[in-house]
């Protein structure tokens, strides 16, 4: 293997190739467009100091995200707007506006934005509200890093139509929302029933506990049995902690 600093000249004369290797040069300077540094004869690279994230952002165009809002959530959005935008502006230091024409919330980085993940956190917060979560529950996504949203449909568990689908949704909700509240309290999650879609907000382990309970109800398990399994799973999770 040739040394990285060797200069190689190849000339073709007839059928023979004459290769001349010049080893008199001890160091090669690379152009700024390449690696912006030098490499000595021993192969040890010498690079310029890496730019900090602040230096990279300086002069760069601010990033922007647009979160679509379903039509049925536009009125609730207007009602809670004075409560929704302060965490985005004061905590994440983002620029935010409600675009009623495109039915969306637009987020953009500002010069004061320091957290590189602020834009993504803001999107998760607004998306959680758009999915149907209460504003006080969605704001937990800004305060805690280990919270997620898991979404699935009833047909992903079992193919149901008509009255069978309605009964499955009724089993998950329970009379007056009793079953849903019991699952939320036992698993420390928040659940939104949006027609045949189910959204669960919580930690990874807690989401799994709540999802197992919801799946059991969809498959037809009696609520009493689901409650017992839910209590056992919650107790085991508490022991691990």
Curated annotation (Swiss-Prot):
Residues 48-71 are annotated as: Disordered. It holds the Pfam family KH_PNO1_2nd. Keywords: Cytoplasm, Nucleus, Phosphoprotein, Ribosome biogenesis, RNA-binding. The modification Phosphothreonine is found at residue 52. Residues 162-214 form the KH domain. One of its GO terms (cellular component) is nucleolus. One of its GO terms (biological process) is rRNA processing. InterPro entries: KH-I_PNO1_first (IPR055212), KH_dom (IPR004087), KH_dom_type_1_sf (IPR036612), KH_PNO1_2nd (IPR055211). The keyword RNA-binding applies. Signal peptide: none annotated. Belongs to the PNO1 family. PANTHER family: RIBONUCLEASE Y, RNA-BINDING PROTEIN PNO1. This is Pre-rRNA-processing protein pno1. The gene is rbp28.
């Amino acid at each position: 293997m040739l040394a990285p600093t060797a200069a190689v000249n190849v000339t073709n004369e007839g059928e023979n190739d004459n290769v001349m290797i010049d080893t008199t040069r001890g160091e090669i300077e690379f152009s700024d467009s390449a690696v912006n540094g030098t490499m000595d004869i021993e192969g040890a690279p010498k690079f310029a100091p890496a730019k900090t994230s602040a230096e990279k952002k300086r002069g760069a165009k601010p990033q922007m995200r647009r979160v679509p809002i379903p039509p049925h959530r536009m009125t609730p959005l207007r009602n809670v707007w004075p409560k929704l935008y302060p965490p985005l502006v004061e905590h994440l230091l983002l620029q935010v506006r409600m675009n009623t024409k495109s039915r969306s919330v637009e987020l953009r980085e500002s010069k004061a934005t320091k957290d590189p993940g602020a834009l993504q956190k803001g999107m998760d917060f607004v998306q959680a509200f758009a999915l149907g979560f209460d504003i006080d529950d969605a704001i937990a996504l800004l305060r805690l890093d280990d919270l997620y949203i898991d979404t699935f449909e009833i047909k992903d568990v079992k193919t149901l139509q008509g009255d069978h689908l309605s009964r499955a949704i009724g089993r998950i909700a329970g009379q007056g929302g009793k079953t849903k509240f019991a699952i939320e309290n036992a698993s420390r999650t928040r659940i939104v029933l949006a027609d045949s879609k189910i959204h669960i907000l919580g930690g990874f382990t807690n989401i799994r506990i709540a999802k197992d309970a919801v799946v059991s109800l969809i498959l037809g398990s009696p609520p009493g049995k689901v409650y017992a399994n839910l209590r056992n799973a919650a107790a085991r999770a508490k022991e691990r902690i």
